[in-house]
Amino acid sequence: MTFTGQAYALGAGTVINAIATWKGAAFGVDLKTFADVELTKESSSFIGTIEGVPHGDTTLIERSMDLVLEHFGIEMGGTVVTRSEVPLASGLKSSSAAANATILATLDALGETLEPLDAVKMGVRAAKDAGVTITGAFDDACASFFGGIVVTDNRTNELVKRTEKEMDVVIFAPDRQSFSSQTNVHNSELLAPWVDMAYDLALDGEYEKAMTLNGFLYCGALGFSTDVMMEALKCGVKGVSLSGTGPAYSALVDRKMADTLTKVWENLGTSGKVINTKINNDGLTKL
């Protein structure tokens, strides 16, 4: 007998990267990662597949399934297939989205529920176990799960603040990948006093100022060009940042500015794609 479940979770953009201080902020975007889970008592193994990435590392989604079953004391195996509108390894929280979607889909298959924050923390644990994150990415996981803009303390897994904001999001995703686990942590930690300033801005609701300061700081520490950000500022954009540990950049804008920035970023002369989306304030759900 098999049990099936489906769910999705959101990608996200960065306001404050938590690597320097373990305090972060992020916003959920209207790009989704979907998970389809099938469980069976005939097996005890977990097999994950990332659609379109035949040799992708599936440790995270397999561990996410395993933790849900372990929590409820259920001995089963199964498969999980994820498909995503979120570019992988680009700083747009594809790992958090995959973990959240898999956990919800597994709960759906079992007919079980968890408190939302418990589900988020389970995904954070799966990400740590799989070695795809440095801080656990609780900020990214909360943005992916709850939507809106979240401010967190990743050391204590505390959701400090959540705000809903109606804004468009423009993303520039270069044609290369950058994995969070390979980030230069030492360089990032040197930024701590200035990242704290950005975090204080986020606590005060000055999200655009916070993310722009964050972007210049982390571009410097991680070796990314600030040209993409400067072109956005020249257009009048107030909030633009390297997203996560890159290589993507994201900007918070109004509708009119979104059209202007899209044209500018499409003509950067850098190989990549421009994605138009918006902040998703609804959070995630089962399908």
From Swiss-Prot:
Gene3D superfamilies: 3.30.230.10
Protein name: Shikimate kinase
Superkingdom of origin: Archaea
Pathway(s): Metabolic intermediate biosynthesis; chorismate biosynthesis; chorismate from D-erythrose 4-phosphate and phosphoenolpyruvate: step 5/7
Any one GO cellular component localisation term in the record: cytoplasm
PANTHER family tied to this protein: HOMOSERINE/4-DIPHOSPHOCYTIDYL-2-C-METHYL-D-ERYTHRITOL KINASE, SHIKIMATE KINASE
Binding site for ATP: P87, L88, A89, S90, G91, L92, K93, S94, S95, S96, A97
